[in-house]
Amino acid sequence: DLRRALNAATRKLDAWAMVDDMPPGNLRLRRQIALRYLAQGFSVPVEEIVLSHGALEALNLCLQALTRPGDAVVVESPCFYGALQALERLGLRAIELPTDAREGLDLSALAGVLERGEARACWLMPNFQNPLGALMPEAKKRALVELLARHQVPLIEDDVYAELYQGGVAPLPAKAFDRQGLVLHCGSFSKSLAPGYRVGWAAAGRFAPQLQRLKLMSSLS
């Protein structure tokens, strides 16, 4: 069904379709993603959503928007190996913090790092952390977002496994508790719908203009 729908849509494309879909990306798809957030109980403006070629590109765009070579980024220990590779490629340093297999990152350790002003950003997986599978409780997610807001340190939220939840009500992302536009929520349909289509996005908060500009530059190169 998905293949037939894609073929039908492709046949209907006109010469201006590629121009219309330049960054931040297809408006109809961004509206549908915004509706998905609304269905979870919180609002994300369509203008905040930037489409990408899978979640990993979105995560990399977030890193580029927030950091410069030599900056330090907080990650979980252990963490997704692709995060460490991305940091190394951009000349960034990893601050690895202990992570519980049930409830996720140690917020006390994070508070110490933030008090010392050592971190430029955080790359974390509050939901279904890779490789531990930890699911941070909602109260702890709220505390995480509030802690980062006090120090004005942005959070890159890697939420690629959210679509695989098998229970009745999916856990909220940390983005749901963001009131200052500091959480850059990255998602993807690659794990649940069609890995080969590489459809991802970032709901980038106050950093959406920077992401859109970076995505445009990479699309034109």
Q: What is the predicted function of each stretch?
A:
Residues 6, 11-151, 163-180:
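Conserved core of the PLP fold type I
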Residues 159:
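Walker B catalytic acidic pair
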